[in-house]
Amino acid sequence: MPKSIMLVSLGAVVGAVARYLLSEATERMFGHHLSEGGFPYGTLLVNVVGCLVIGILGGWGVPDLSNSTTRLLLITGLLGALTTFSTFGWESLELMQNGKVGVALVSIGLNVVVGLVAVYGGYLVGQYFVSEVVS
């Protein structure tokens, strides 16, 4: 098996399990599931966590996000399996089809805005770690 497939697979296993555990914990905490008319908190959480992590990695310069090994393991594998654009899209459509257009728009807005804020915040945290280690 090529090294690239092994790296993506390893990262994806960790990311998928983390996604499942975070989504389940979120559902238990809030007691709502989308099928019961609830807000898709689990999807929002995993997407924001993924954005935060990629921001931290980018700000920290771990080791170089354009490095193929790092990118395959952490970005394509781990964060690719952790975050979920397709589920986000499906849940948004499902909310709209069920007449919850306002809830869908809030979910869309939160995923996009909070996700971008998390990437930037993570980047600043990563930069802070770099400045502390170098100093």
Spell out what each predicted region is.
Residues M1-S135:
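Membrane-interface helix-loop junctions in multi-pass transporters/channels
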